[in-house]
Amino acid sequence: MATEALHMHKDRLSAEDLDLKDPHVSSSLALFAIHNLIRRNLKACAEHAITVQPANIDAFVTYAKYTLHVLRDQLTSVDEIWFPVFAEHDPRFLAQKDAHDALYQRITAVDAQLATPPAELGQNELLSAEIAAAFAELHELTDKQYDLEEDLINQLGRKVPMDTIRGLEKKQEERRRADVKVYGHLWTAVYLLRGLDPKERAIFPPGIPKLIAGGMLTAGAMQFRR
């Protein structure tokens, strides 16, 4: 039935828990998975900001800035592509764009803090503590917002026709390809791999051969992930 809820949950994203043959479930999986990836990486930034060693400051700042970029891009994607269409079936999605404004402001503020020269950042314990607190707060606010949006997605169920969803997915893919041109396929793929848990990774691959993916994970190409 078109009104049937999806019953997806952020802690149960696996082939055992989901009917991946259901096109509405499989299409919603990407949203739930990227939410989890962002949750984990925001938390990682909060934890590492005050413990990172001076020799790794550059790597941490790069990772932290990209995490903010992914969050901003994800919010912009749903604001511009997905939620306006979903709002035709549930007007509560319109309110989410306004709710995102506070997150955009905090992202900009934290990004400005990360603009501090790495050498200075590594020696400024107070600033490091402020950045850690800012990431922790951003994680908390984002987590609550994502919980709400995932509940709305579940309630939306199968109301949006799959032909419409496929059109939205095409627009989303165009955004992803543009982003990859800027940051590189290897960087974005590794970032995805390191942020997903094994069960999520098994059903939401970022599009690179498993042999190469395994090598990346074994090599530990990115230190700051959780």
Curated annotation (Swiss-Prot):
Q: What does this protein do?
A: Part of the gene cluster that mediates the biosynthesis of the isocyanide xanthocillin and its derivatives. The first step of the pathway consists in the conversion of tyrosine into a vinyl-isonitrile intermediate by the isocyanide synthase xanB. Subsequent oxidative dimerization of this intermediate to form xanthocillin may involve the cytochrome P450 monooxygenase xanG, whose expression is coregulated with that of XanB.
Q: Which organism is it from?
A: Aspergillus fumigatus (strain ATCC MYA-4609 / CBS 101355 / FGSC A1100 / Af293) (Neosartorya fumigata)
Protein name, please?
Xanthocillin biosynthesis cluster protein F
Q: What pathway is this protein said to act in by its record?
A: Secondary metabolite biosynthesis
Top-rank taxon: Eukaryota
